[in-house]
Amino acid sequence: TDGVGTKSEIARETGRLDSIGRDLVAMCVDDLVCAGAAPLFFLDYLAVGRLDPDAAESLVAGIADGCAEAGCALIGGEMAEHPGVMAADQFDLVGFAVGAVERDALLDGTAAVAGDVLVGIESPNLRSNGFSLARRLAFDVAGRSLDDPAWEGASTTLADEMLAPSVIYAPAVVAALAAHEIHAVAHVTGGGLPGNLPRVMDNTLDAVVDRSTWEVPRFFCELQNMGDVSDDEMERVFNMGLGMVLAVPVHDADAVVATLASHDRPARVIGELTVGSGQVRMDGTRQGDA
């Protein structure tokens, strides 16, 4: 079960509701694959201040598109009007996904071992996390508007970058799980890499991540520069260009990367697990505009 957080406010303010449903599906099904489960079906809950049939249609169409890409069935949902509690154009969207995994294939955080390498899968945008900070930086600190260019000379606006749809990783990760030995899968959501990698390893391991192994998308760098935010805070709020991380035996890393690439999900080795105490260490110098 998950939602899309305050990204929905950007969608409401712009009236661009067509992709927010896809974001919802991504947040739910990509959590499922962290347990090794393949998504089976999906339900949604939509609360509105006042029902707008066109808006509801756009939201549900986005959910249906996301489910089709994720390979799960949209089997139902619930819609509720909350007049007097929510503003007429406000909405809240929640999703619920169910998947299946054989008991002996369940990923529970105990399989990862020292020497495993970390394979990061690229995320070109914010996905659905960090929007409270992103909104504060762009609107309150920098005084920008949604129609402004995302950066000087950009062909996209702030709204375009903030509403860019989340990548759905589930089909590619399910394929990799079926073909290779994978010890852990982490969904990089709120908390970033430092907050999510500890969920998939025990406290006898450390995750050592090399920042120089991938390029941070420019919009993250633009947000950071708007408010002079520290690297540590950026990495604890945003995905910084990596939406999922897999822990795999070193001998299988290249094959896993190739399988993910064959499903149009570019990935690369970004670090390793070492003997430790449950910490995440961010080493190296970041690629991307600082």
Predicted regions and their residues:
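Glycine-rich phosphate/pyrophosphate-binding loop regions near the starts of catalytic domains
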Residues: 1-124
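Gly-rich Lys/Arg/Thr-decorated short loops/hinges at beta-loop-alpha junctions or inter-strand turns
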Residues: 3-12, 150-157, 201
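Short helix/loop capping segments that flank catalytic or ligand/cofactor-binding pockets
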Residues: 8, 128-130, 196-197
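A generic structural signal for residues located within well-ordered alpha-helices
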Residues: 20, 129, 165-168
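Short loop/turn motifs at secondary-structure junctions
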Residues: 36-38, 133, 181, 266
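Glycine-/charge-enriched secondary-structure boundary and capping motifs
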Residues: 55-73, 86-91, 145, 152-163, ...
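Short, acidic (Asp/Glu-rich) active-site segment that either coordinates a divalent metal cofactor
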Residues: 92, 105-158
